[in-house]
């Protein structure tokens, strides 16, 4: 049986979500000043480790989480940019780890990058940096 927490209307910590990591990596959001909440045994709670992870996200152009937000959940996210190339949002897909192996994750990264390449957001779309949670 597959189950997942209903995140609709809930605050999702940036450091534990794929979209949050994209937003942190590209300075759309700020790492919270306090302690990072541990949601699972895989959640990154050390800020130095998080910065290392965010550097990987910047270099790769996408984020992947496995078991960081909740056990058995995998998520992939890519940045969405405006006409000037400024990251203003993130596009994500998530699902159960049993269905999202590494091959499928790689496929989703390509699909997401392809979809965001079709989006032409005007420069009038900007972001207000947020701390902590989406």
Residue ranges of model-derived segments:
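Nucleotide phosphate-binding site architecture
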Residues: 24, 81, 94
């Amino acid at each position: 049986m597959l189950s997942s927490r209903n995140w609709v209307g809930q605050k999702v910590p940036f450091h534990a979500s794929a979209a949050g990591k994209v937003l942190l990596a590209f300075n759309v959001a700020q790492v919270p000043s306090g302690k990072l909440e541990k949601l699972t045994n895989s959640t990154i709670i050390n800020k130095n480790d998080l910065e290392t992870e965010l550097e990987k996200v910047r270099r790769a152009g996408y984020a992947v989480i496995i078991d960081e937000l909740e056990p058995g959940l995998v998520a992939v996210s890519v940045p969405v940019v405006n006409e000037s190339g400024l990251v203003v949002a993130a596009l994500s897909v998530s699902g159960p780890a049993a269905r999202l192996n590494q091959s499928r994750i790689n496929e989703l990264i390509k699909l997401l990058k392809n979809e965001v390449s079709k989006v032409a957001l005007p420069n009038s779309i900007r972001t207000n940096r947020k701390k902590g949670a989406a």
